A protein has these predicted regions:
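An acidic, charge-biased composition feature
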Residues: 1-340
Length: 340
């Protein structure tokens, strides 16, 4: 199920699609009453999943009141699908959203020419690989395929992953911002190179919230090691991983220039301060998951995310003689979303 990675050019300076400017965070984050749907497709084709984001989820969200919280992710369990969460809907609004999703998915979700229909055997093989690569709980086993369509679901926040219950509303506001950015960017992504560069620049914007250059360098180095380990657990051969992580020549990146991710960086940096004040968790542990979910929303694979960290670890190596941080800046277990 994991596509071949797209190499990121050394000079990662291609123009980025314009994305939404981040609004200021709410004065006080509060708990949201979430309604969830899983939008299942009969193909793993990235183009089909992009189409569901732009032609199904996007128009449905735009019909809601301005400022309605929402977010989406892409996932594999029970078959390829997008998980949509919308906040604070009353009963009538829930019914309208579900009806709109159902109507639009019926039109946009069918595989287009060149989008291969899902092979159940291939799903099981790929899902078994993903389940074995560091998953926990119910996702260590492969669930039966669900048919294409809109399936009501439950949202279970991952409190531990995002720094604790008190920090979850702030994390969810970042889910909304990340989803808004990707929804704005996808129609303007004309190549896989642009998609990869978006993920690269978004990750730089995240790392810049961690502090000095040494902190960022350790974040990239640990991220590279973690993703390589998870890729190996998923069954990818060492020779392939060597190829993906090989970066030659100079990489031109300005770590302080965030372009369309300027608002994203500002909100991430503010959240890093919240984590330092309210949680014993290293901010990098939480921000690593936010960077991963940006990759996920952009539709990038495990191997493509590994490539992101290979490029950044090459561009910003750990300075010689730098003390090892007291706590790891990235998690030791898989960052893949589970219940979100």
């Amino acid at each position: 199920m994991t596509p071949t990675p797209i190499p990121i050019p050394a000079a990662a300076t291609a123009p980025l699609p314009t994305a939404a400017t981040a609004p200021p965070p709410p004065p006080a984050a509060r708990a949201t009453d979430w309604t969830a749907w899983h939008l299942h497709l009969g193909t793993t084709a990235r183009s089909a999943h992009d189409r569901v984001v732009t032609d199904v989820i996007g128009p449905t969200i735009r019909e809601l009141a301005p400022g309605t919280p929402w977010f989406f992710i892409r996932y594999w369990q029970s078959g390829p699908h997008l998980r949509l969460r919308v906040g604070d809907l009353d009963t009538a609004a829930r019914a309208r959203v579900e009806a709109a999703l159902t109507e639009r998915l019926a039109a946009a979700g069918a595989p287009a020419p060149g989008e291969e229909p899902l092979d159940p055997a291939a799903y099981r093989s790929g899902a078994e690989r993903l389940a074995a690569a560091g998953e926990t709980g119910e996702n260590t086993s492969v669930k039966a395929l669900l048919p294409p369509g809109v399936h009501p679901a439950a949202y279970e926040p991952e409190f531990d992953r995002y720094g604790g219950r008190a920090l979850m509303p702030a994390a969810e506001s970042l889910f909304t911002l990340s989803s808004d950015l990707v929804l704005a960017a996808l129609p303007r992504v004309g190549s896989e190179r642009q998609r990869a560069v978006l993920a690269l620049r978004g990750t730089v914007a995240v790392a810049a919230a961690l502090g000095d250059p040494a902190d960022r360098a350790y974040y990239y180095a640990h991220g590279l090691g973690a993703w390589r380990a998870w890729a190996a657990e998923a069954g990818h051969p060492a020779e392939l991983l060597d190829t993906i992580t090989r970066v030659e020549g100079a990489v031109t990146l300005d770590p302080g220039s965030h372009g369309p991710f300027a608002g994203w960086h500002a909100r991430i940096a503010a959240h890093a301060d919240e984590i330092r004040e309210q949680s014993p968790t290293h901010p990098g542990m939480v921000l690593f998951s936010h960077a991963h979910m940006l990759h996920n929303r952009l539709g990038l694979s495990l191997l493509e995310e590994l490539r992101t960290y290979a490029v950044l670890a090459h561009a910003f190596p750990v300075p010689e003689g730098t003390p090892v941080p007291a706590s790891a800046p990235v998690p030791a277990s898989t960052p893949a979303p589970r219940n979100v």
